[in-house]
From Swiss-Prot:
Reactions this protein catalyses: Endonucleolytic cleavage of DNA to give specific double-stranded fragments with terminal 5'-phosphates
Name of the gene encoding the protein in the UniProt record: nmeDIRP
Enzyme Commission number, as recorded: 3.1.21.4
Organism: Neisseria meningitidis serogroup C
GO process terms (BP): DNA restriction-modification system
Keywords, ordered alphabetically: Endonuclease, Hydrolase, Nuclease, Restriction system
EC class: hydrolase
UniProt protein name: Type II restriction enzyme NmeDI
Length: 351
Protein backbone atom coordinates (compact mmCIF):
# COMPACT_ATOMS: atom_id res chain seq x y z
CA UNK A 1 0.00 0.00 0.00
CA UNK A 2 2.98 2.33 0.43
CA UNK A 3 3.13 5.15 -2.07
CA UNK A 4 -0.61 5.43 -2.74
CA UNK A 5 -1.71 8.99 -3.45
CA UNK A 6 -4.84 10.96 -2.62
CA UNK A 7 -6.72 13.49 -4.72
CA UNK A 8 -8.64 16.59 -3.72
CA UNK A 9 -11.84 14.68 -4.44
CA UNK A 10 -10.82 12.01 -1.89
CA UNK A 11 -10.26 14.61 0.83
CA UNK A 12 -13.46 16.48 0.02
CA UNK A 13 -15.50 13.27 0.05
CA UNK A 14 -14.04 12.28 3.43
CA UNK A 15 -14.84 15.67 4.98
CA UNK A 16 -18.30 15.67 3.40
CA UNK A 17 -19.04 12.40 5.21
CA UNK A 18 -18.69 14.18 8.57
CA UNK A 19 -21.76 15.66 10.24
CA UNK A 20 -22.45 19.30 9.40
CA UNK A 21 -22.94 22.04 11.99
CA UNK A 22 -21.20 19.96 14.64
CA UNK A 23 -18.28 21.37 16.62
CA UNK A 24 -14.92 19.78 15.80
CA UNK A 25 -11.82 20.35 17.92
CA UNK A 26 -8.39 21.33 16.65
CA UNK A 27 -5.54 18.82 16.78
CA UNK A 28 -3.57 21.21 18.98
CA UNK A 29 -5.30 20.88 22.37
CA UNK A 30 -4.14 24.35 23.40
CA UNK A 31 -6.46 25.80 20.74
CA UNK A 32 -9.83 25.75 22.50
CA UNK A 33 -11.83 27.04 19.54
CA UNK A 34 -13.94 24.73 17.40
CA UNK A 35 -14.79 24.36 13.71
CA UNK A 36 -18.08 23.63 11.97
CA UNK A 37 -18.59 22.41 8.41
CA UNK A 38 -21.13 24.67 6.72
CA UNK A 39 -21.07 23.45 3.12
CA UNK A 40 -18.97 21.14 0.97
CA UNK A 41 -18.81 21.67 -2.78
CA UNK A 42 -18.14 18.35 -4.49
CA UNK A 43 -16.12 16.92 -6.09
CA UNK A 44 -13.03 19.03 -5.22
CA UNK A 45 -14.16 21.96 -3.09
CA UNK A 46 -14.25 24.63 -1.89
CA UNK A 47 -15.30 23.80 1.66
CA UNK A 48 -17.08 26.47 3.66
CA UNK A 49 -16.39 26.35 7.41
CA UNK A 50 -17.31 28.38 10.46
CA UNK A 51 -14.95 29.29 13.30
CA UNK A 52 -16.77 31.09 16.06
CA UNK A 53 -18.94 33.65 14.29
CA UNK A 54 -16.70 33.83 11.24
CA UNK A 55 -17.27 31.92 8.01
CA UNK A 56 -14.40 31.22 5.63
CA UNK A 57 -13.63 28.91 2.73
CA UNK A 58 -10.90 26.38 2.08
CA UNK A 59 -10.18 26.59 -1.64
CA UNK A 60 -9.95 23.78 -4.17
CA UNK A 61 -6.33 24.76 -4.77
CA UNK A 62 -5.49 24.44 -1.07
CA UNK A 63 -7.15 21.04 -0.84
CA UNK A 64 -5.18 19.85 -3.85
CA UNK A 65 -1.97 21.15 -2.32
CA UNK A 66 -2.45 19.01 0.78
CA UNK A 67 -3.67 16.00 -1.21
CA UNK A 68 -0.52 16.15 -3.30
CA UNK A 69 1.59 16.04 -0.12
CA UNK A 70 -0.11 12.94 1.33
CA UNK A 71 1.07 9.39 0.63
CA UNK A 72 0.26 6.18 2.47
CA UNK A 73 2.04 5.90 5.80
CA UNK A 74 4.11 9.08 5.41
CA UNK A 75 3.65 11.74 8.13
CA UNK A 76 2.93 15.24 6.81
CA UNK A 77 3.42 18.52 8.67
CA UNK A 78 0.46 20.60 7.45
CA UNK A 79 2.02 23.82 8.72
CA UNK A 80 5.02 23.23 6.46
CA UNK A 81 2.83 22.39 3.46
CA UNK A 82 1.09 25.75 3.62
CA UNK A 83 3.38 28.03 5.61
CA UNK A 84 2.40 30.38 8.40
CA UNK A 85 0.43 32.76 6.19
CA UNK A 86 -2.48 30.34 5.66
CA UNK A 87 -4.89 30.70 8.57
CA UNK A 88 -7.16 27.84 7.44
CA UNK A 89 -4.42 25.19 7.59
CA UNK A 90 -5.17 24.04 11.16
CA UNK A 91 -8.88 23.82 10.38
CA UNK A 92 -8.29 21.61 7.33
CA UNK A 93 -5.89 19.48 9.36
CA UNK A 94 -8.45 19.10 12.16
CA UNK A 95 -11.34 18.14 9.89
CA UNK A 96 -9.25 15.51 8.14
CA UNK A 97 -8.11 14.13 11.51
CA UNK A 98 -11.79 13.45 12.28
CA UNK A 99 -12.12 11.25 9.18
CA UNK A 100 -11.47 7.50 9.55
CA UNK A 101 -8.29 7.10 7.47
CA UNK A 102 -6.37 10.12 8.80
CA UNK A 103 -4.60 9.98 12.16
CA UNK A 104 -2.60 12.67 13.91
CA UNK A 105 0.80 11.93 15.37
CA UNK A 106 3.71 13.64 17.04
CA UNK A 107 7.15 12.69 15.80
CA UNK A 108 10.47 13.02 17.53
CA UNK A 109 12.64 15.52 15.70
CA UNK A 110 16.40 15.73 15.17
CA UNK A 111 17.57 19.11 16.42
CA UNK A 112 20.91 20.01 14.82
CA UNK A 113 23.53 21.68 17.01
CA UNK A 114 27.01 23.09 16.54
CA UNK A 115 28.87 19.92 17.55
CA UNK A 116 26.15 17.29 17.79
CA UNK A 117 22.47 16.73 17.18
CA UNK A 118 19.85 15.73 19.73
CA UNK A 119 16.40 14.22 19.44
CA UNK A 120 13.64 16.43 20.82
CA UNK A 121 9.85 16.42 20.86
CA UNK A 122 8.65 17.34 17.40
CA UNK A 123 5.66 18.99 15.77
CA UNK A 124 2.24 17.50 15.10
CA UNK A 125 1.71 15.72 11.80
CA UNK A 126 -1.11 13.88 10.10
CA UNK A 127 -0.71 10.46 8.52
CA UNK A 128 -2.91 8.59 6.05
CA UNK A 129 -3.48 4.94 7.06
CA UNK A 130 -6.23 3.55 4.81
CA UNK A 131 -5.81 -0.02 6.08
CA UNK A 132 -6.62 0.79 9.71
CA UNK A 133 -9.60 3.19 9.84
CA UNK A 134 -10.66 4.63 13.19
CA UNK A 135 -14.08 5.82 14.32
CA UNK A 136 -15.52 8.63 12.22
CA UNK A 137 -16.01 11.98 13.93
CA UNK A 138 -13.27 11.55 16.52
CA UNK A 139 -9.54 12.21 16.36
CA UNK A 140 -7.16 9.34 16.96
CA UNK A 141 -3.46 9.64 17.74
CA UNK A 142 -1.09 7.27 15.97
CA UNK A 143 1.69 6.16 18.29
CA UNK A 144 5.01 5.99 16.47
CA UNK A 145 8.74 5.94 17.18
CA UNK A 146 9.54 7.60 13.87
CA UNK A 147 12.18 10.33 14.07
CA UNK A 148 12.16 13.11 11.49
CA UNK A 149 14.94 15.39 10.30
CA UNK A 150 13.30 18.40 8.70
CA UNK A 151 15.10 19.98 5.77
CA UNK A 152 14.48 23.61 4.84
CA UNK A 153 11.84 24.21 2.19
CA UNK A 154 13.16 25.48 -1.11
CA UNK A 155 11.64 28.42 -2.92
CA UNK A 156 11.63 28.88 -6.67
CA UNK A 157 12.36 32.48 -7.66
CA UNK A 158 11.49 33.96 -11.05
CA UNK A 159 12.74 37.23 -12.52
CA UNK A 160 10.26 39.91 -13.60
CA UNK A 161 8.22 39.25 -16.73
CA UNK A 162 7.07 41.91 -19.18
CA UNK A 163 3.87 40.70 -20.85
CA UNK A 164 1.85 42.33 -23.64
CA UNK A 165 -0.91 44.62 -22.34
CA UNK A 166 -3.56 42.97 -24.51
CA UNK A 167 -4.90 40.68 -21.76
CA UNK A 168 -7.36 41.22 -18.91
CA UNK A 169 -5.96 41.16 -15.37
CA UNK A 170 -7.06 37.53 -14.90
CA UNK A 171 -5.62 36.54 -18.28
CA UNK A 172 -2.34 38.22 -17.38
CA UNK A 173 -2.09 36.18 -14.15
CA UNK A 174 -2.70 32.96 -16.09
CA UNK A 175 -0.24 33.94 -18.83
CA UNK A 176 2.42 34.93 -16.28
CA UNK A 177 2.18 31.52 -14.61
CA UNK A 178 2.25 29.83 -18.01
CA UNK A 179 5.47 31.63 -18.98
CA UNK A 180 7.09 30.99 -15.58
CA UNK A 181 6.59 27.26 -16.12
CA UNK A 182 8.06 27.54 -19.63
CA UNK A 183 11.08 29.30 -18.09
CA UNK A 184 11.45 26.49 -15.55
CA UNK A 185 11.23 23.85 -18.29
CA UNK A 186 13.88 25.60 -20.38
CA UNK A 187 16.19 25.88 -17.35
CA UNK A 188 15.72 22.18 -16.57
CA UNK A 189 16.48 21.37 -20.20
CA UNK A 190 19.63 23.50 -20.20
CA UNK A 191 20.96 21.79 -17.07
CA UNK A 192 20.31 18.36 -18.57
CA UNK A 193 22.02 19.17 -21.87
CA UNK A 194 18.91 19.78 -23.97
CA UNK A 195 18.16 22.67 -26.28
CA UNK A 196 14.65 24.02 -25.79
CA UNK A 197 12.13 25.33 -28.28
CA UNK A 198 9.69 27.81 -26.73
CA UNK A 199 6.53 28.70 -28.69
CA UNK A 200 7.28 31.39 -31.28
CA UNK A 201 4.72 33.82 -29.82
CA UNK A 202 6.37 33.63 -26.38
CA UNK A 203 10.00 34.10 -27.41
CA UNK A 204 9.69 37.89 -27.50
CA UNK A 205 8.54 38.17 -23.87
CA UNK A 206 11.08 39.88 -21.63
CA UNK A 207 12.36 37.86 -18.68
CA UNK A 208 14.64 39.86 -16.42
CA UNK A 209 16.94 41.78 -18.74
CA UNK A 210 16.63 39.38 -21.71
CA UNK A 211 14.09 38.19 -24.21
CA UNK A 212 13.18 34.54 -23.75
CA UNK A 213 14.69 33.86 -27.17
CA UNK A 214 18.08 34.97 -25.80
CA UNK A 215 18.13 32.71 -22.73
CA UNK A 216 20.70 29.92 -22.52
CA UNK A 217 19.86 26.89 -24.60
CA UNK A 218 16.84 28.34 -26.42
CA UNK A 219 16.25 27.25 -30.03
CA UNK A 220 15.51 30.45 -31.94
CA UNK A 221 14.43 28.85 -35.22
CA UNK A 222 12.49 25.61 -35.25
CA UNK A 223 13.35 25.37 -38.95
CA UNK A 224 16.95 24.61 -37.97
CA UNK A 225 15.94 21.39 -36.22
CA UNK A 226 16.22 18.54 -38.74
CA UNK A 227 14.09 16.28 -36.56
CA UNK A 228 11.23 18.66 -37.38
CA UNK A 229 12.10 20.39 -40.66
CA UNK A 230 12.68 17.15 -42.58
CA UNK A 231 8.95 16.42 -42.65
CA UNK A 232 6.23 18.28 -44.54
CA UNK A 233 4.02 20.41 -42.33
CA UNK A 234 5.92 19.64 -39.13
CA UNK A 235 7.57 23.07 -38.79
CA UNK A 236 4.19 24.79 -38.86
CA UNK A 237 2.73 22.26 -36.40
CA UNK A 238 5.66 22.71 -34.00
CA UNK A 239 5.70 26.51 -34.18
CA UNK A 240 3.20 27.04 -31.35
CA UNK A 241 4.02 24.01 -29.20
CA UNK A 242 4.84 25.48 -25.77
CA UNK A 243 8.07 23.57 -25.21
CA UNK A 244 10.12 20.95 -27.07
CA UNK A 245 13.38 19.48 -25.81
CA UNK A 246 16.07 18.46 -28.34
CA UNK A 247 19.27 16.56 -27.66
CA UNK A 248 22.34 16.12 -29.85
CA UNK A 249 20.35 16.76 -33.03
CA UNK A 250 19.21 13.14 -32.86
CA UNK A 251 16.75 12.91 -29.98
CA UNK A 252 13.59 14.69 -28.90
CA UNK A 253 13.16 13.79 -25.21
CA UNK A 254 9.85 15.63 -24.73
CA UNK A 255 7.12 17.61 -26.44
CA UNK A 256 5.19 19.60 -23.83
CA UNK A 257 2.05 21.70 -23.73
CA UNK A 258 1.54 23.94 -20.69
CA UNK A 259 -2.20 24.09 -20.07
CA UNK A 260 -4.87 25.11 -17.61
CA UNK A 261 -7.99 22.94 -17.45
CA UNK A 262 -9.82 24.73 -20.27
CA UNK A 263 -6.92 24.18 -22.68
CA UNK A 264 -6.00 20.55 -22.04
CA UNK A 265 -7.84 19.19 -25.08
CA UNK A 266 -6.43 21.82 -27.43
CA UNK A 267 -2.93 21.08 -26.13
CA UNK A 268 -3.41 17.38 -26.80
CA UNK A 269 -4.72 18.20 -30.27
CA UNK A 270 -1.62 20.28 -31.09
CA UNK A 271 0.67 17.49 -29.93
CA UNK A 272 -1.26 14.87 -31.89
CA UNK A 273 -1.07 16.99 -35.04
CA UNK A 274 2.72 17.17 -34.69
CA UNK A 275 3.10 13.49 -33.79
CA UNK A 276 1.13 12.42 -36.86
CA UNK A 277 3.57 14.32 -39.09
CA UNK A 278 6.71 12.76 -37.61
CA UNK A 279 8.21 9.26 -37.65
CA UNK A 280 7.91 7.31 -34.38
CA UNK A 281 10.95 8.73 -32.59
CA UNK A 282 12.22 6.53 -29.76
CA UNK A 283 11.80 7.75 -26.19
CA UNK A 284 9.89 10.94 -26.99
CA UNK A 285 7.51 11.89 -24.20
CA UNK A 286 4.26 13.67 -25.08
CA UNK A 287 3.50 15.68 -21.98
CA UNK A 288 0.74 17.88 -20.58
CA UNK A 289 2.14 20.28 -17.97
CA UNK A 290 -0.69 21.55 -15.79
CA UNK A 291 -1.58 22.72 -12.26
CA UNK A 292 -1.82 19.98 -9.65
CA UNK A 293 -5.54 20.58 -9.22
CA UNK A 294 -6.15 19.83 -12.92
CA UNK A 295 -4.85 16.25 -12.72
CA UNK A 296 -8.25 14.60 -13.13
CA UNK A 297 -9.03 16.76 -16.17
CA UNK A 298 -5.70 15.83 -17.80
CA UNK A 299 -6.25 12.11 -17.22
CA UNK A 300 -9.80 12.25 -18.57
CA UNK A 301 -8.81 14.05 -21.77
CA UNK A 302 -5.67 11.95 -22.32
CA UNK A 303 -7.83 8.82 -22.38
CA UNK A 304 -10.15 10.10 -25.11
CA UNK A 305 -9.69 7.52 -27.92
CA UNK A 306 -8.32 9.99 -30.48
CA UNK A 307 -5.47 10.96 -28.10
CA UNK A 308 -4.54 7.55 -26.68
CA UNK A 309 -1.68 6.97 -29.11
CA UNK A 310 0.15 9.94 -27.54
CA UNK A 311 0.60 7.84 -24.39
CA UNK A 312 0.44 11.17 -22.58
CA UNK A 313 2.40 11.88 -19.42
CA UNK A 314 1.30 14.42 -16.80
CA UNK A 315 3.89 16.81 -15.38
CA UNK A 316 2.28 18.79 -12.50
CA UNK A 317 3.45 22.33 -11.79
CA UNK A 318 4.68 21.27 -8.34
CA UNK A 319 6.91 18.58 -9.89
CA UNK A 320 8.23 21.00 -12.51
CA UNK A 321 9.28 23.43 -9.80
CA UNK A 322 10.68 20.65 -7.60
CA UNK A 323 12.90 19.51 -10.48
CA UNK A 324 13.76 23.11 -11.41
CA UNK A 325 14.83 23.82 -7.83
CA UNK A 326 16.86 20.60 -7.73
CA UNK A 327 18.60 21.41 -11.03
CA UNK A 328 19.54 24.90 -9.87
CA UNK A 329 20.58 24.00 -6.31
CA UNK A 330 22.47 20.80 -7.13
CA UNK A 331 23.69 21.76 -10.61
CA UNK A 332 22.35 18.54 -12.09
CA UNK A 333 23.71 17.64 -15.51
CA UNK A 334 23.24 14.82 -17.99
CA UNK A 335 26.49 13.37 -16.61
CA UNK A 336 24.82 12.91 -13.23
CA UNK A 337 21.38 11.68 -14.34
CA UNK A 338 19.89 10.10 -17.45
CA UNK A 339 16.66 10.92 -19.24
CA UNK A 340 14.75 8.24 -17.32
CA UNK A 341 15.25 10.45 -14.26
CA UNK A 342 12.59 12.74 -15.78
CA UNK A 343 10.01 9.97 -15.50
CA UNK A 344 10.25 10.15 -11.70
CA UNK A 345 8.53 13.55 -11.92
CA UNK A 346 5.87 12.63 -14.48
CA UNK A 347 2.87 10.34 -14.35
CA UNK A 348 1.53 8.17 -17.16
CA UNK A 349 -2.06 9.07 -17.98
CA UNK A 350 -3.29 6.40 -20.39
CA UNK A 351 -5.02 3.47 -18.73
Amino acid sequence: MSGQKLTAANLVSAIDSLKKNVNYNYVNSSNTHTIQIVHVEKPEGPIKIKRGDTETSISKQAIWRLADALSTGEPVNVDRVFGASYNFRSALEALLAHTPEIYWCKLQRIQPGLNKSEVVEGHKHIIWLPDRPHEKGVMKEYETDVVISEIPSNNVVYDALSLPSTHSEIDIDVKRRHVQIQIALSAIGFQLGFRTWIARNDQGISYGDKKIADLDGIVQKIESEKLISSFDGAVQAAMNIDCIWFRNGKLMPAVMEVEHSTGVRSGLARMKQLKDLLPPYANTRWVIVAPDEDRDKVFKEANVPMFKNLDTQYFPYSAVEELYSLCIRRKLTNKAVNEEFLDCFMEKCVM
